[in-house]
Amino acid sequence: MLKYALPLYPIAESTDESWSYEHLDKLTTYAEFNETQLLYSEDDDRDHNNETRKPMPHQILVANYTTPRSPIDGIIVIHGVGTGKTLTAILAMINNITAGHDQGMKRGLVLTPNRAVMNSFRNELNCYYRSRFSDRHLNDFEIDRYLSKTFFFNTITAFANTVSRTSDVVLHKEWNATFVVIDEAHDLSVQGVDYPKINGFLKLLTSRKVILLTATPMRNNLSDLVPLHNLLMKLSTHDITVEQFNRDLVTRENCAEYVCARESPTEYFLRKFAGLVSYLPSIVDVNEVDIVNVGERGLYGLRNTVIVVHDMSDVMSATYHYAGAGERSDRDVALLRQRQICRFVFPDGTYGAEGYATWMDNKTGRPTRKFLDMLRGGTGTSREDILKNVAKYSPRYAWIAKSVIDAAERGEKSMVYDDLVTGSGLLVFAAVLEALGLERGYGRGARSFLCLTREVMTVPSIVSALKIFNDRKNVKGANVAIILGSRVIAEGITLKDVIHEHVVAHWNDAETEQIIGRGIRYQSHAYTIADWGSDAKPNVFVYRHATIDSRKKNIKTVDILMYATSEAKRKNIDGALRALSSVALTCRNSNNTFVKSVYRGRYTGRNITNDNTIPLDAPRVTKSFIAQLDQLFDYRNQNVVVKVDSLLKMFNIDPNSKYSLELLFVIMNTIQKHGQLDVDKYIDCNGQYISISKCVDEFRQRPTFVYPFVLDNVSLYGLDVYRDTLAKDIISPLILLDAERHTGGLYPMTRLPVIVIQGLLELAISTQGTKDPYDTLNKMIQYYGTSTNGDNDIRAAVWLATTTGDDSGYRILNEHSGSWVSCPSSMVPFVQAMKSSVEAQLNNDMLAKNLKYYGVLHPSTDDFCIKTVSQNTPTNRRCVMTGRKCVTWSGEKLKELARDIGIDTGDSSSVQNRKTICYNIRSKLEELGAVITDVTCGVQAKRK
């Protein structure tokens, strides 16, 4: 539901699934969806020294969408191949982490499918920082130290294994308040072993932001979206299952085709994913190159796929049909044997693993001498003769080999991709190139090729090879012109200035798109274009290869079957993408440039004002507040249950107050959601008990911690309701009216810990202005005290200083930034003058009651002090006694004071201890309305 993705409104029931499109309409009016600069990063976009890394509108949108002010916990970034998803994630992390020491996340965690992608991501981050701050006098050591302390990288599988070995408590303590980025998030499938571990880990974190990067969120079925949805949910109760998805979120209709069922999204599908997605298709339409799909369209019933066909040799045809004639129980459901044969049949008629073991070296992945001789057909033969001989075993490999060699000799780079490496796969094609005289490695230009697979290269070697291949000097293949790649380069890798891309058939189009996108992406052909001498765009040629058998035209080979299956799946996926785009968040500035009209979505920003930022700032709460919880609860136990009354007393709130539980919830909820606290306790409010657990598994089974009261005007003020409702509850006189009637003082909030007073008061005052329907500041001043000075900020600072004491310093609200800052020295005299005026007024009130003394109560320690009423306004005095603790007065003096206010102390022979006398004095002064709260009870405060 949208409310799970956009928790903008306090709710009474967490299981309610109410939702409306109007909520998303309101959200998109804010600057996060319209601003062209990063809102909260300290970096100015104009400082960029490298224009190629200047953020684009769709990247800024995501970065601003996940700021500390935003209530959004996570988003699926479905941006097409080549749109700069890596930089999008980098900007989002920086925009959040650098937004403020007490607001943003503490660290970034990047999880990638493999180490090659991880190194590529890390290099992009390093390059961005060095380019970004090259004029900030930061050396490499300073940058490396900052990055190593702030950003952590790991592969998905390695981190999942770490999660499985680590307790929940340790994981929460170590990783709470983390900005998590999962690259190629579609690799986390429901059937995989890593998904439940990563999903459980994210559920542990009470404070986190999550970005899931993917260009192809669905590979085979629409239900591939299930893990992406669940990874964003903070509670497991909000997760959905594949069965629920297929039942409620899509309609399924069996096709006459042999490939797959037709799936269509429902309205419930839109509701589930609204607000969770940022959608942007691939930017090939506006790329600087023209994409040419080589081959024929419409072959073998394929409607959209352009393929290059290769007719089987006689040996391949016989082997292929013999392999397909076996019993079904003996067949691989993925037709792996047929796929191997379509690639290559070895000279002895074997294929796949059997032929590889005979003709290839298992340790090195290189061909045996015997195999090379067989491929060459003898010594002294020409290239044409070798290719003709290779065609007996694989017409496809012979055709591709000739194509890439001819291209290399023209100064054009090529990429050949295959998901099968051993068997009849990529390493056998490498053997064909070696038979033609090419060498593995680099340095010989058109005579060199690289084989980027984990079977023959380490990850560092692959990263180094990619740098050489992408280097400016290698734009025309001067060092190496041909690159062979497996799944290790299928995602998250950039191949620059590739002119020819050769790919094989896949069971889904998503993998094919990912592979093609390695060489066609943003700025991928910048060097080629810089050297281009024509007004026409350079061409990039894409070859989708398929092996057929012209001898049996009524039989479709496995390659044709795979392409047909991909087309059928593409229909379903395109329908789901259109549905996602209709409820996706898009920035207005990117619509005309990147997003096709059908994909622009119905929600774009409008009504932009300078004040249009999401109005959610967490109160300034520090760990000292949590320290008090530690004193009350013994967290060494697995579970702790304490009565609500005990917790209320901890905060000096009267348990008999009608509104005490309401205030308690506001405080506890604020603590739970604050990103900088590392609260590793799980709090549940249920009736008259507060349960706290260190075990999140048990906490998951408990009801969600929600407002224990019904809010009014929830839909009247839109986004402001969350903020204003909280502010209203904080400053409302009714919140503790029952508890405060007997005191006669103006201090309901002063009974809370000082740091909480400051944070809640600052939040309340920050809501002042035309968008404050509750008139928060004026109500606060009216309730807590008035002043003749018309400056609201100064009055707020005076009240805050009076409440928290001089040691906390004076703080005022900066009307331009909307944040609280230390009081400028020029304003300190005004604050002190007003503070003295307030104290003088208090003294005069006591004189009007004909009292010589009044009581002072410390809000946190509950110490009771007695202060003498001065006959003159306490000004121009170096030091004023704020009041001694009552129990430190002499017995005779206490009896005298008690008699002055009408307390019977008995005759001179009666004996009463000082504690009893102090209790009687406090009770009497409370009846007279002569007890105030002050944190300076029992100490001296110097005044200059």
From Swiss-Prot:
TM segment ranges: none
Catalyzed reactions per annotation: ATP + H2O = ADP + phosphate + H(+)
Residues that bind ATP: 79-86
Ranges where the Helicase ATP-binding domain occurs: 66-235
Broadest EC class assigned to this enzyme: hydrolase
InterPro entries documented for this protein: DEAD/DEAH_box_helicase_dom, Helicase_ATP-bd, P-loop_NTPase
Entry's Gene Ontology molecular function annotations: ATP binding; ATP hydrolysis activity; nucleic acid binding; RNA helicase activity
Keyword Hydrolase (UniProt): yes
Domain Helicase C-terminal, residue spans: 451-523
E.C. number(s) listed in UniProt: 3.6.4.13
KW ATP-binding (keyword) present: yes
Keywords, sorted A to Z: ATP-binding, Helicase, Hydrolase, Nucleotide-binding
Alphabetical list of Pfam families matching this protein: DEAD (PF00270)
Coiled-coil regions listed in the entry: none
Cross-referenced SMART domains: DEXDc (SM00487)
Motif (DEAH box): 183-186
Family: Belongs to the DEAD box helicase family. DEAH subfamily.
Protein's recorded name: Putative ATP-dependent RNA helicase
Organism: Heliothis virescens ascovirus 3e (HvAV-3e)
